Amino acid sequence: MTVILAIESSCDETGVGIAELTPDGSVVLLADEVASSVEEHARFGGVVPEIASRAHLEALGVTARRALDLAGVQRPDVVAATIGPGLAGALLVGVSAAKGLALAWGVPFYGVNHLGGHIAADVYENGPLPECVALLVSGGHTSLLHVRSLAEPIEELGATVDDAAGEAYDKVARLLGLGYPGGKVLDELAQQGDSSAVPFPRGMTGPRDARHSFSFSGLKTAVARYLEKHGVEADFSPADVAAGFQEAVADVLTMKAVRAATDLGVSTLLIAGGVAANSRVRALAEQRCAETGLTLRVPPLRLCTDNGAMIASFAAHLVAAGAQPSSLQAAADPGLPVVKGQVH
């Protein structure tokens, strides 16, 4: 058995996960500890890179100690870390710590892709991942991916050409005065509204648009213009606006994801990333997968957002596939593409 300790520090969550790779290739989660600095960023309306980096420095040691104690592990067999994509300073904190631990313990270091980690998080509760189309949707990324296995390069079928879906959520939440982060609170507000009361446009859904690409900037602008025109009216309903916006996002995401799976002839759709926790995205995906005979896989809510467990899982799959460790000179790559699962 191989025990992997993994560090996630790409944005504002400091995560340390510990997983065990068993002889049969299964990955078992032993510990998952997360410290978030989201409250420190909330007063600025978004993530401040310098604050995020400092928060990682302050939280990482304590978080790692908690994870080791919870797992009952003294010395892992492998140390891994998110090496990209993400905020440069934040990545450097986690990567530097992981390299130091690997050197001190005398174990291999694996610098792995954050986006691959989101996909790998699914295996803890849903078992080995078959060939699938993955809809990776978060604050910084919205992509459709063809995943043959977690040990092979991931193919990007399409991505957002402007705002990520999670970014659009935060911006619309700010327009509605809901604060930051906006995803969860906007979702809750939308559940109180009528999604058909305020119809909003669905970007890049025309016959000439790229089948597997997304655009949310026009939707964000449409919400802003609606608020400028109707926000002062006596019967204005923020809940209806939230519901209409959320329906537009969920409609496009799930429609294109199901279509991509059908185009490729695969039978499984995986939705991963922070926006995979959204209630309407999950419900509409379940409905459309049932209608088309697709198997839907979504990680549990606690593993949708950034965490160390997902990085441990992805690293475990690389180890199982015989991937060589990363060099201790491997550099963090803020723009690391999803097709590159590991930096050597």
Curated annotation (Swiss-Prot):
UniProt EC number: 2.3.1.234
Main location per the UniProt record: cytoplasm
GO molecular-function terms, A-Z: iron ion binding; N(6)-L-threonylcarbamoyladenine synthase activity
Cofactor or coenzyme needed: Fe(2+)
Catalytic activity, as annotated: L-threonylcarbamoyladenylate + adenosine(37) in tRNA = N(6)-L-threonylcarbamoyladenosine(37) in tRNA + AMP + H(+)
InterPro entries, per the entry: ATPase_NBD, Gcp-like_dom, KAE1/TsaD, Peptidase_M22_CS, TsaD
Localization, UniProt: Cytoplasm
Alphabetized UniProt keyword annotations: Acyltransferase, Cytoplasm, Iron, Metal-binding, Transferase, tRNA processing
Enzyme class: transferase
Positions that bind substrate: L136, V137, S138, G139, G140, D170, G183, D187, N278
Cofactor note as given: Binds 1 Fe(2+) ion per subunit.
One GO location term (cellular component): cytoplasm
Annotated residues for binding of Fe cation: H114, H118, D306
UniProt superkingdom: Bacteria
A biological-process GO annotation: tRNA threonylcarbamoyladenosine modification
Alphabetical list of CDD domains matching this protein: ASKHA_NBD_TsaD_bac
Pfam families registered for this protein in UniProt: TsaD
Family indicated by similarity: Belongs to the KAE1 / TsaD family.
Function recorded in the entry: Required for the formation of a threonylcarbamoyl group on adenosine at position 37 (t(6)A37) in tRNAs that read codons beginning with adenine. Is involved in the transfer of the threonylcarbamoyl moiety of threonylcarbamoyl-AMP (TC-AMP) to the N6 group of A37, together with TsaE and TsaB. TsaD likely plays a direct catalytic role in this reaction.
Protein name: tRNA N6-adenosine threonylcarbamoyltransferase
This protein's encoding gene: tsaD
